[in-house]
């Protein structure tokens, strides 16, 4: 294992290199671009033996991923924002075709107005596509999650694609120490992809054929069952990863939740700030905890209910908006926790900074609520 001070984008590229995909179709887009650049260099320098395809668009990138995966090889790609939106048609196809693709998404706001800065609207818009979704907090977690995603996606009981989501600029361009495991250890944890079904000219078959009402619903139900099965596969993979590499992950992560009266729920890099503020609030006598939702799909319903069982109030921070009802995570958690007070807070859209003062405001508004959903950090003239 080697310790390097690198960005989360480089951490993702290092993880992809360690996973040894055979095909990498990618189209660069800010703030994902350096992922594609690192991978291109790895291939050009002979460090990674893969077919690096310089496609003309993100739609083509995902189409090439589907074709390569259907032919039975491990594939990787990366995108962001408008690129993911352009992929939308094929994102759904990849899940329906049961292609175990792994894709990194550098979370960035969607136009309009045009923004290159961070929020999570792009990946949230794909939450119903049939892809597993992991939201990471650090460069280390980004690297580890790419490796874990291959292990889970390629399991014969799952065979669904995975999206590793990392906050644009906040993570993608920030450097920090990251442990890079040895190729030998990764090969032991992640063996070569063994496809169950693949396109083979010697044994012709069809993949992704037209279907009618007699079969379509059952096909979608198979995706649902695979998503449900993935929970235990994720937990098992995380246990084995911890035994080999010493870092623990799960569907969710609890921080000072056991005796918390108020629990803040969030995804991604903001969780680091939340921990710092929670420690300060604890010093002031406020019983506040954090529930980090690491895996958004499959949705960790039982883990969320268990984590908040002792809390009287729950505050959900969303870096996205489902217009007229609040953030996506808030709508799901409020539906899940009908027996307690759940409040939603829209934060950080388009890269708006989320400060410790904003988090303290969220706690105050949860203690003395005025409405179910509140936008935090707006300019005064907009309120």
Curated annotation (Swiss-Prot):
GO BP annotations listed: response to oxidative stress
EC number of the protein: 1.2.7.1
InterPro entries in the record: PFOR_II, Pyruvate:ferred/Flavod_OxRd, Pyruvate_synthase_PorA, Pyrv_Fd/Flavodoxin_OxRdtase_N, THDP-binding, Transketo_C/PFOR_II
An MF annotation (GO) of this entry: pyruvate synthase activity
Disulfide bond annotation, renumbered to this chain: none
Reaction(s) catalysed (UniProt annotation): 2 oxidized [2Fe-2S]-[ferredoxin] + pyruvate + CoA = 2 reduced [2Fe-2S]-[ferredoxin] + acetyl-CoA + CO2 + H(+)
Keywords annotated in UniProt: Oxidoreductase
Residues making up the signal peptide according to the UniProt record: none
Record note on quaternary structure: Heterotetramer of one alpha, one beta, one delta and one gamma chain.
Database matches in NCBIfam families: PorA_Arch
Protein name per Swiss-Prot or TrEMBL: Pyruvate synthase subunit PorA
């Amino acid at each position: 294992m080697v310790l390097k001070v690198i960005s989360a984008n480089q951490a993702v590229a290092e993880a992809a290199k360690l996973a040894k995909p055979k095909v990498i179709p990618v189209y660069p887009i800010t703030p994902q671009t350096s992922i594609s650049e690192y991978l291109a260099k790895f291939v050009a320098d002979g460090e990674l033996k893969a077919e690096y395809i310089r496609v003309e668009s993100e739609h083509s990138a995902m189409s090439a991923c589907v074709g390569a995966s259907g032919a039975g090889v491990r594939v990787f790609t990366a995108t962001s924002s408008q690129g993911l939106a352009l992929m939308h048609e094929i994102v759904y196809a990849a899940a329906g075709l049961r292609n175990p693709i792994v894709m990194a998404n550098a979370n960035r706001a969607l136009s309009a107005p045009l923004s290159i800065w961070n929020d999570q609207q792009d990946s949230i818009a794909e939450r119903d596509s049939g892809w597993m979704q992991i939201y990471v907090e650090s460069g280390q977690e980004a690297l580890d999650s790419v490796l874990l995603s291959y292990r889970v996606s390629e399991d014969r009981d799952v065979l669904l694609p995975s999206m590793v989501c990392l906050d644009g600029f906040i993570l993608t361009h920030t450097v920090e120490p990251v442990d890079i495991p040895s190729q030998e250890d990764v090969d032991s944890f992640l063996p070569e992809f063994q496809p169950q079904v693949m396109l083979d000219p010697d044994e012709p078959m069809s993949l992704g054929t037209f279907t009618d009402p007699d079969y379509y619903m059952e096909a979608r139900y198979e995706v649902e069952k695979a998503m449900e099965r993935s929970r235990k596969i994720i937990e098992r993979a995380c246990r084995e990863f911890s035994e080999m590499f010493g870092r623990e992950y799960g569907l969710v992560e609890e921080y000072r939740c056991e005796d918390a009266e108020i629990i803040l729920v969030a995804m991604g890099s903001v969780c680091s700030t939340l921990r710092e503020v929670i420690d300060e609030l604890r010093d002031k006598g406020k019983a506040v905890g954090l529930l980090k939702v690491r895996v958004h799909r499959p949705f960790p319903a039982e883990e969320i209910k268990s984590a908040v069982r002792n809390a009287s109030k729950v505050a959900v921070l969303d870096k996205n908006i489902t217009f007229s009802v609040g953030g996506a995570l808030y709508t799901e958690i409020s539906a899940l926790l009908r027996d307690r007070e759940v409040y939603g807070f829209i934060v950080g859209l388009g890269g708006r900074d989320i400060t410790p003062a904003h988090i303290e405001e969220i706690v105050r508004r949860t203690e003395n609520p005025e409405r179910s959903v509140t936008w935090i950090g707006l300019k005064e003239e907009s309120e």
